Amino acid sequence: MSALMKTDPEIAEAIRLETRRQAGKLELIASENFVSEAVLEAQGCIMTNKYAEGYPGKRYYGGCEYVDIAENLAIERCKALFGADYVNVQPHSGTQANMAVYFSALSVGDTILGMNLAHGGHLSHGSPANFSGKFYNVVPYGVDRETETIDYNQVEDLALQHKPRMIVVGASAYPRTIDFEKFRAIADKVGALVMADIAHIAGLVATGLHPSPVPVCEYVTSTTHKTLRGPRGGLVMCQASYQKTLSSRVFPGVQGGPLMHIIAAKAVAFKEALTDEFKDYQSQIVKNAQALAKELIGRGYRLVSGGTDNHLLLMDLTDKGLTGKEAQESLDSAGITVNKNGIPFDTRGPMVTSGIRIGTPALTSRGMKEEEMRTIARLIAEVLEHRDNEKHLMAVKEEVGRLCQNFPLYAERIASA
């Protein structure tokens, strides 16, 4: 009997069930992924016991010589991965990384430009519900109604009109390549700083499959999960001249002690990301997303912007007579996990929506390729077109189960679950 089962059987059972859920369903949420056993091992290590306020070599606690090794490895590997001057691996999340940048570069009430959440942006880019929308004067930009891609002319017009202190670039539901050079040129016209949040596309950026913002932006933030396939956490990079202020805004500005077991796991993930195999994996993510998109379009589904350049796609269900919420629930009942998502100019609220967001990082981690994506597109279409037919949904669920068995996940853990 495991220590956890003996101490807390309720939590042990929840973990067992979640293990089986992940292994037995098709995970298509764009922000989720499956970390390696090595990352899991590091994340669950005894470094969780160590307090280490401060930075390597400059801690407020004794006994940090070995956690310093882990943090220095994470920093140097991340620098090599992105070609950054300065990296801070302590942020607990992407939002806290963004917060550290804001507190480093802005004063309360300063004007920032950020992508409209309803057009694919992120809460921490100026949503009124988030601290960023409460502390700063936020001017949202969005996508063009016809192309559904970022309207750079609008961005420039807004920048010239409002003279922002910072332009925030990045998205949580945008399927196309972001032109960081254009944002840099616009910012230079008004003397603005640029922060790029690459949380969703970090793996693609690290492997050269998406243009990098690091050479052209003062600040770059990211999560360490999603396409980077590391533990849940954040990081922030900046040009050398900003590092002293930024480091003091991470600690003690917005955080106390870093999570050293998570930083150790970040170091492992960064090492994995520096391999040729990881580049092949990222390339396959994009191939899979594009294969999935092509098959869905062929089956009569409209995708926002007409397709994808990266790891995700947005399905517009407006003309299908169902909401994103209904689609998510129907697909989940058949073993396919997606999330309801607003589409640009959506008339439905965020808890209902007119679309769903689909991503390929997790299934690519399982080894699935274009052939499986075409099968999955067919299964998605069958569920949405026969969502009231219980017999049909069960047939899809059985096919999903067979597909998952052919691409096993965490085999040893499943065997003991």
Curated annotation (Swiss-Prot):
Q: Please give the chief subcellular localization of this protein.
A: cytoplasm
Cellular component, GO annotation: cytosol
Quote the PROSITE patterns the UniProt record gives.
SHMT
List all membrane-crossing ranges: none
- The EC designation for this entry is 2.1.2.1
Q: Which GO terms describe its molecular function?
A: glycine hydroxymethyltransferase activity; pyridoxal phosphate binding
- The N6-(pyridoxal phosphate)lysine modification is found at 226
Q: Which CDD domains match?
A: SHMT
Which residues are (6S)-5,6,7,8-tetrahydrofolate-binding? 117, 121-123
Instruction: Please name the top-level EC class of this enzyme.
Output: transferase
Print the keywords alphabetically. Answer: Amino-acid biosynthesis, Cytoplasm, One-carbon metabolism, Pyridoxal phosphate, Transferase
Q: Which reaction does it catalyse?
A: (6R)-5,10-methylene-5,6,7,8-tetrahydrofolate + glycine + H2O = (6S)-5,6,7,8-tetrahydrofolate + L-serine
Q: Which HAMAP family match?
A: SHMT (MF_00051)
- PANTHER family, per the entry: SERINE HYDROXYMETHYLTRANSFERASE (PTHR11680:SF50)
UniProt xrefs under NCBIfam families: PRK00011.1
Family in the record: Belongs to the SHMT family.
Q: Indicate what this protein is called per its UniProt record.
A: Serine hydroxymethyltransferase
Whose protein is this, by species? Syntrophus aciditrophicus (strain SB)
Its gene? glyA
